[in-house]
């Protein structure tokens, strides 16, 4: 038997074994919504990107409703630096002036969102790319910082109008959401992707919220990986 055929057979057997083991979980989550915050190495490494989207498509095939909310920090930083703008952060949030919000929207909606949609479609699924501005999905107001700092167009979500997500899922498709929001005046707000994923999951009453990220966990200081909080009670988070 040719070596490549033998390898393909081994991969098939391994995947079949995984599916058999996963059957109880597949039945448990059939028809349930799972929100996935997509970031970290899974977003930048080509092989991981492809395998992650294959897993998302499989989730849809077995009856789950995956909803992807993606970040894009490194790509935004790269584009800003190409334009001669130094990225600035305060307490883990991007300082977003008029020029930066335009770059954020361009990179998130014009590049990253479309790439994810393409990967899902190539893996056999059907994805629809939207931002939080579409269908009035996410409404936000200016975020308030304890020390009074002005972060520019950084928003705090005040409402999630999730009908557009339901429409996409019910049509057998996978929504891919860029974390931007709008307000009654039509302004564009930059939303932290983790926050957006959490708010969307809560509004959808999702069964699970999954974070794909390089961050080791909840950090006391978002800029310091050594500040990992290893144990925390629910009331302390709230």
Explain the meaning of each model-derived region.
Residues 1-238:
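Nucleotide/pyrophosphate-binding catalytic subdomain
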């Amino acid at each position: 038997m040719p070596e490549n055929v033998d390898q393909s057979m081994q991969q098939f057997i391994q995947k079949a074994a995984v599916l058999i083991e996963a059957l109880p979980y597949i039945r448990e989550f059939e028809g349930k919504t799972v929100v996935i915050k997509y970031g970290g190495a899974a977003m930048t490494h080509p092989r991981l990107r492809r395998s992650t989207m294959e897993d998302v498509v499989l989730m849809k095939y077995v009856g789950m409703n995956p909803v992807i909310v993606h970040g894009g920090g490194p790509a935004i930083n790269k584009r800003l630096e190409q334009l001669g703008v130094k990225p600035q952060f305060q307490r883990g949030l991007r300082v977003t002036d008029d020029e930066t919000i335009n770059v954020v929207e361009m990179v998130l909606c014009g590049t990253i969102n479309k790439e994810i949609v393409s990967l899902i479609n190539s893996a056999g699924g059907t994805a629809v790319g939207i931002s939080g501005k579409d269908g009035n999905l996410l409404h936000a107001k200016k975020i308030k910082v304890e020390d009074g700092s002005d972060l520019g167009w950084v928003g705090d979500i005040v409402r999630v109008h999730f009908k557009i997500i339901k429409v996409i899922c019910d049509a057998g498709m996978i929504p891919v959401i860029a974390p931007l929001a709008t307000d009654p005046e039509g302004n564009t707000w930059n939303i932290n992707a983790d926050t957006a994923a959490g708010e969307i999951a809560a509004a959808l009453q999702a069964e699970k919220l999954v974070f794909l990220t390089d961050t080791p966990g909840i950090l006391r200081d978002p800029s310091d990986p050594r500040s990992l909080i290893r144990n925390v009670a629910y009331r302390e988070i709230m």
